[in-house]
Amino acid sequence: MSERASRETWRLKRRVDHIPRMLRDLSPASQSKRLVVLGRSSALQGLVRQIVIWLGFVVGFALVSSLAGNRAHVALANGLRVVEAEKWLLHGLPELVVQRTVASSAVLTFLTVLTYRASEFVVVSAALVWVYLRRRWAFTQFRNTIFAASLVALVCYFVLPTAPPRMFPGLGFVDTVAHAGGPSRDPGVLSLAANEYAAMPSLHAADALIVGVTIALLARRRLVKVVALLWPAWVWLCVMATGNHFALDVVAGSVVAGLSGAAVHAHARAFPSSSADSPASALR
């Protein structure tokens, strides 16, 4: 009997020992920790979903855009029209001055080529991830503005295929990216579906402006704001220095960015429930 009583006492003690743990699990602090874990898990799943959407959009855009790249004679003629327009409006070709200035410095050449190759996909992707993780309430508008600008540009590439400056060596332009080594367009699988006549408007210029303004508005540190505001101007210089866009391409890209941002913002105000994420879900 004493052995049986001892076992019952031990079992009762184990049950009693579990009570503080159960109470701790029911405490506000414990519940808060669980909510944080669930929130982070949900954020990770959401991030993966958004990455898939973004990559799908990029691949789809490249494939559709490539369908507009088979009218070389039209694109070259339109490129010459841009040249004539710049000579009339600007009394010259500012891209030539930019190219020659940058070409005089190996460091500047390296930086402009690196920026051209990375600014369109790498930087935009990084900005999307940062906004999603740190300012998720602004993510939908940011992403949709990128999408809208890309779709407007895509329509322009079909309607108005335009050759970039690098295709006019007779005017003094140089394909800086090709001379630096590697493909003229973005590296990787997407280069197989690249549209060589997608100069007007400059999507590099449009996306740089969208990214720069968005990060400047959302960032808290002054240095980050300043760098973000300078980013578009630097990209604009780089796309001209590498011979990939005329100045008018950059202007057109900036207009596309502005109109896309205004349209997405107007839609968000008209339909707030479908155009914004909850601030409470953002990871600080």
Per-region residue spans from a language model:
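N-terminal transmembrane-helix/juxtamembrane module of multi-pass inner/ER membrane proteins
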Residues: S2-V123, L283
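Membrane-interface capping segments at transmembrane-helix boundaries
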Residues: T9, L23, A266-D277
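Alpha-helical transmembrane segments of integral membrane proteins
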Residues: Q45, R49, I53, T140-T145, ...
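Aromatic-anchored segments of alpha-helical transmembrane domains
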Residues: V59-L63, S150-F158, L230-M240
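Membrane-interface loops
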Residues: S65, A72-E84, Y132-V224, F271-R284
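Hydrophobic alpha-helical transmembrane segments
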Residues: L114-V129, H204-G212
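Interfacial helix-loop-helix junctions of multi-pass membrane proteins
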Residues: P164-L171, N195-A199, W234-S260
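Hydrophobic transmembrane alpha-helices
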Residues: G212-L217, A257-H265
